[in-house]
Amino acid sequence: MATRRSKTPAPGVSLRDTLVHAGLESSLADLLAEMPHRILHVDPRRPFREPGSPRDEVMFVRSGILAKYKTDGSGRRQIVALRFAGEGILPRDASAGYGIQAIVKSEVMVGKARDFDRIVDAHPELQRFFLRLIQRNETFGYE
């Protein structure tokens, strides 16, 4: 029997709830969830951030799955990490050596690095929280 796939992403996961579930204090999760941002709807297998482009933004997956990829010598994309609903990709000071694409139709919250940095600078416990998440992600991926 054939099934129909929705043309829109699955309902988004609350960023606030995901961060609180991961161990972040609710008031800090509220600050991140209320940060100025825009929502992107991303189609599968189409890179929306190419390797080498600036990473002056923070991204949180609201629904779907994102892949961080690197291009091998033959030009094929090799997935090095996945981000699921509620997880994020943090900003960098330099260009990133990886690209980002959706695995399935996804919805992504994108904020400016300076807004994110302002919140993190004012609340040092956020640095410790994100450091723990980065260490956890490195355990599972090739980042």
Language-model-derived ranges and their functions:
Residues M1-E143:
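Cytosolic regulatory regions built on CNB/CRP/Popeye-like sensor folds
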